[in-house]
């Protein structure tokens, strides 16, 4: 409610109409439920990607168009640039500490063409200074957290609360398959270092620190914003988690939406 009131007051300061839409059920279905289901599959989800894809640039964008809006402007820290051939590209923000391009990866060409990120070229301190100069009540409001519906960071409890299902006990095994003990459920335990999760056998694979790292991975759910799927191996910098430092790598397309 505080966020809604802040938005109303800022809209009043700017002389803009302020609307409130209730997408509680959609948020639960498209973000929270998907988050819980992914954990139950042994995956590590990023609900911010789903929130942007299905809520902000899905339902909210559709409602904005219905209201006659030409573009959707948000406070995301990212940049949009049009290429010489007319296509749009998503770029990182000027402030690397606040860059949110990672969680906007599902934006399409059509969405990029009708989206504006006015904060993309600013540092957070500059954005706050502008907000303060214009008398915005939220100029010094605390930054939002990565997962808004798990404020305490207890993902296991959140999954149980969302699904109503208790995690089934299983075995801890090392990288050689040797049993090490039992766990309370695959969403609840991470002693030592988790090297893998075998969902069909309900096993958490543990290993030493040096066994944790890998020089390659397979990824699915790829979004090629340009519309062109690379036909040859591509040298890029990449990361697998939000705010993680990028690393150089070679990406090879292996399927319709998969890469190695």
Functional labels for PLM-detected ranges:
Residues 1-105, 116, 124-126, 132:
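ATP-dependent adenylation/nucleotidyltransferase module used to activate substrates
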């Amino acid at each position: 409610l505080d966020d809604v009131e802040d938005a109303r007051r800022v809209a009043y300061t700017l002389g803009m109409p302020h609307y409130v839409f209730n997408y509680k059920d959609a948020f639960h279905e498209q973000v929270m439920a998907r988050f819980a289901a992914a954990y139950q599959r042994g995956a590590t989800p990023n609900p911010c990607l789903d929130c942007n894809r299905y809520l902000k640039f899905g339902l909210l964008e559709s409602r904005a168009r219905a209201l006659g809006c030409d573009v959707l402007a948000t406070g995301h820290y990212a940049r949009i640039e049009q290429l010489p051939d007319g296509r749009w590209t998503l770029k990182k923000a000027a402030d690397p500490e606040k860059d949110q391009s990672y969680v906007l990866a599902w934006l399409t060409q059509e969405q990029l063409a009708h989206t504006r990120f006015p904060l993309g070229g600013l540092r957070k301190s500059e954005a706050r200074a502008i907000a303060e100069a214009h008398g915005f009540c939220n100029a010094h409001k605390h930054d939002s957290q990565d997962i808004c519906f798990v404020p305490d960071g207890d993902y296991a409890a959140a999954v149980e609360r969302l699904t109503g299902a208790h995690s089934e006990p299983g075995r801890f095994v090392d990288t050689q398959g040797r049993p090490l003990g039992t766990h309370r459920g695959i969403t609840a335990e991470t002693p030592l270092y988790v090297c893998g999760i075998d969902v069909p056998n309900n096993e958490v694979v543990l290993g030493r620190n040096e066994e944790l790292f890998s020089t390659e991975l397979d990824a699915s759910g790829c979004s090629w914003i340009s519309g062109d799927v690379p036909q040859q191996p591509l040298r890029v910098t990449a990361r697998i988690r939000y705010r993680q430092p990028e690393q150089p790598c070679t990406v090879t397309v292996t399927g319709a939406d998969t890469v190695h």
